[in-house]
């Protein structure tokens, strides 16, 4: 992320607190004009803003989904923390606390750890050390080509990778690891030009293969006969999930939204898309709280 976007995101975050002045103005206006309908409308508008800005983005939901793939595994799936301008280590601590309450085989993180962060990164990632399960991850587009402050791309990648490693997070792009009764492989981010599914396509192991990637648009091009399931993120479920409107802003070309999607064509794996934990652009969510997904594979 370029230099100007970092202070811009921080300014947007701080200016949103001015809503409290709007409350004062609405009440003062009522006492001056005694217009109850006008007051009700203004308070409703301000209340909706407060919910979207201050309540829902800080409410961490839990969602459990059973998926049949032919082998048992219990996976905690999270993504899109977007640490930096809007969320920090205190939010991660709450996420880690909830993860540690789960009985699972591993934790998978589907990318986009960052959004307009300031260096150093270690304080943001430090709470991840507290996760008591094996943690495997891939990176997303905001971790690769929209990082910022302005650094060379190679240096950016090195900083992110090393900071996550120090926090106990193992990046598994083009690798295979075991999680319960399944094998998991990581595929790099599509938008960052790092999508490479050769390891998945060459897999011939006995365990069903689960592919972890950031962008669900990777799934139709996977062409991995052993692949039984793709886990992805990126969409935020629209973030501000206003019915009928949010689908117009989903950052995907395929029919991917949130939750479990059936195979697009025979031979394709199903795709599960988590709606993530953080926010980009506007620091708001609606009808779509941050979520920790618990997947019971069987």
Q: Where would I find each of the regions flagged by the language model?
A:
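Beta-strand-turn-beta hairpins that frame and shape the catalytic cleft
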Residues: 66-76, 169, 176-185, 205-206, ...
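Non-catalytic terminal accessory segments
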Residues: 1-61
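Membrane-embedded segments
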Residues: 71-170
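Conserved beta-sheet core of the metallophosphoesterase superfamily
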Residues: 216-296
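Solvent-exposed loop/turn segments at secondary-structure junctions
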Residues: 83, 113-116, 141-145, 177, ...
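Binuclear metal-dependent hydrolase catalytic cores centered on His/Asp/Glu-rich metal-binding motifs
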Residues: 147-169, 173-176, 180-213, 219-221, ...
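Active-site neighborhood of phospho(di)ester-bond hydrolases with catalytic His/Asp-centered motifs
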Residues: 77-79, 106-112, 134-141, 172-174, ...
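Extended recognition/assembly regions associated with phosphoester-bond processing machinery
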Residues: 13-16, 20-23, 61-66, 201-220, ...
């Amino acid at each position: 992320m370029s230099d100007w976007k970092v202070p811009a995101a921080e300014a947007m975050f701080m200016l949103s607190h001015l809503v409290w002045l709007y409350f004062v103005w609405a009440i003062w206006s009522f006492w001056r004009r005694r217009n109850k309908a006008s007051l009700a409308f203004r308070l409703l508008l301000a209340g909706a803003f407060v919910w979207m800005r201050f309540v829902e983005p800080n409410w961490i939901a839990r969602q459990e989904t059973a998926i049949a793939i032919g082998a048992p595994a219990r996976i905690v799936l999270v993504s899109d923390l977007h640490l930096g301008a809007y969320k920090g280590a205190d939010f991660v601590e709450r996420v880690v606390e909830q993860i540690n309450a789960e009985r699972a085989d591993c934790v998978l993180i589907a990318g986009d750890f960052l959004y307009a962060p300031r260096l150093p990164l270690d304080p943001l990632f430090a709470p991840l050390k507290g996760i008591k399960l094996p943690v495997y991850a891939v990176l997303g587009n905001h971790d690769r080509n929209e990082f910022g402050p302005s650094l060379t791309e190679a240096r950016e990648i090195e900083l992110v990778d090393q900071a996550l490693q120090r926090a106990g997070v193992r990046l598994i792009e083009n690798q295979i690891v075991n999680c319960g009764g399944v094998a998991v492989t990581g595929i790099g981010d599509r938008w960052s030009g790092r999508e490479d599914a050769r390891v998945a396509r060459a897999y011939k192991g006995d365990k069903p293969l689960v592919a972890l990637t950031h962008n669900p648009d990777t799934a139709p091009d996977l062409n991995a006969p052993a692949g039984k399931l793709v886990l992805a993120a990126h969409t935020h479920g629209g973030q501000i999930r206003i019915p009928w409107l949010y689908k117009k802003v989903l950052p995907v070309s395929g029919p991917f939204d949130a939750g479990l999607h059936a195979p697009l064509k025979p031979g394709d794996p199903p795709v599960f898309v988590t709606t993530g934990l953080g926010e980009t652009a506007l620091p708001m969510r609606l009808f779509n709280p941050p979520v920790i997904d618990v997947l019971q594979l069987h």
